[in-house]
Each structure stands twice: as C-alpha cells, then as structure tokens.
Amino acid sequence: MIKFLLFLAIAAATVISNAELAVPTASISAHVLDISGGSPAGGIQILAFILLNNGWTNIGSQFTQDNGRVDWVSPDFTLIPGTYRLVYITEPYYTAKNVESFYPYVEVVFNIRNATQHYHVPLTLSPWGYSTYRGS
C-alpha cells in the first residue's frame, strides 16, 4: 500500500511538472484586471490573431480563468515574427455584472520581432476605460 501511495505521489508530481512545462517560452499570455472593483476579470474571451498577407488570421481563442489569466492564448500556433492582435471581448463580462460599459471589446495590436521570447499582454479594465502594457 505504501509503495502504491508513493507511486501516486510521484505520478501527480510528474503531471504537475509537465503542466508547468507545457507553455513554451515563445508564447503569448494575457491577464485582465477589473480596476473598478479591484479584482481579476475571469471569463473574458480573448481572441488571438496574426497579420498574414494583409489579413488577420485567427490563431487562438481562450477565456480568462478566475484569476484573470490566460497562460497561453495560442497553444496550436508557433510564434513567428510579425504583427499580432489580441481582442478582449469585454461586453459579456460587464453585462453579467449588470454594469453598463463603453467598450464592447478592446483590441491590442503589437509587434513581435523576437519569436523566441515570452510576451505577456495585461489589460487593466473599467467600464469606461482601459490600459495595456507589455508585462513580464
């Protein structure tokens, strides 16, 4: 029985380690904070695009977790140098809270020149404004 429990503990640690390693260094993550309430904004859909041949190509769609984070917005896409766009769909978030908001969505367009780096794109949000920056 002790050997079996030890096996389960090692297996669980392996799964946790693999989950932590699943997100590559070359990736885009996001974080949404609702500054009007001072809390993370869970449940916001984030769409990811890359500009290819003068048009936007969808490379991923994720929802923020309860902590407001998306660890990897485009898990099925390998980063390449280029222009990217994240679209944070904010209207359903505020509608669910019965709060009027000015922006139905927020678009953030940015350049990736070094596709081997990690890019973190946080959004601080309120019903009447927003701000974004390159995080770490």
From Swiss-Prot:
<feature type="signal peptide">
    <location>
        <begin position="1"/>
        <end position="19"/>
    </location>
</feature>
<dbReference type="Pfam" id="PF00576">
    <property type="entry name" value="Transthyretin"/>
</dbReference>
<keyword id="KW-0659">Purine metabolism</keyword>
<dbReference type="InterPro" id="IPR023418">
    <property type="entry name" value="Thyroxine_BS"/>
</dbReference>
<dbReference type="GO" id="GO:0033971">
    <property type="term" value="F:hydroxyisourate hydrolase activity"/>
</dbReference>
<dbReference type="InterPro" id="IPR023419">
    <property type="entry name" value="Transthyretin_CS"/>
</dbReference>
<feature type="binding site">
    <location>
        <position position="69"/>
    </location>
    <ligand>
        <name>substrate</name>
    </ligand>
</feature>
<comment type="function">
    <text>Catalyzes the hydrolysis of 5-hydroxyisourate (HIU) to 2-oxo-4-hydroxy-4-carboxy-5-ureidoimidazoline (OHCU).</text>
</comment>
<comment type="subunit">
    <text>Homotetramer.</text>
</comment>
<dbReference type="InterPro" id="IPR014306">
    <property type="entry name" value="Hydroxyisourate_hydrolase"/>
</dbReference>
<feature type="binding site">
    <location>
        <position position="133"/>
    </location>
    <ligand>
        <name>substrate</name>
    </ligand>
</feature>
<dbReference type="GO" id="GO:0006144">
    <property type="term" value="P:purine nucleobase metabolic process"/>
</dbReference>
<keyword id="KW-0732">Signal</keyword>
<keyword id="KW-0378">Hydrolase</keyword>
<dbReference type="InterPro" id="IPR000895">
    <property type="entry name" value="Transthyretin/HIU_hydrolase"/>
</dbReference>
<dbReference type="InterPro" id="IPR023416">
    <property type="entry name" value="Transthyretin/HIU_hydrolase_d"/>
</dbReference>
<protein>
    <recommendedName>
        <fullName>Probable 5-hydroxyisourate hydrolase ZK697.8</fullName>
        <ecNumber>3.5.2.17</ecNumber>
    </recommendedName>
</protein>
<feature type="binding site">
    <location>
        <position position="31"/>
    </location>
    <ligand>
        <name>substrate</name>
    </ligand>
</feature>
<comment type="similarity">
    <text>Belongs to the transthyretin family. 5-hydroxyisourate hydrolase subfamily.</text>
</comment>
<dbReference type="InterPro" id="IPR036817">
    <property type="entry name" value="Transthyretin/HIU_hydrolase_sf"/>
</dbReference>
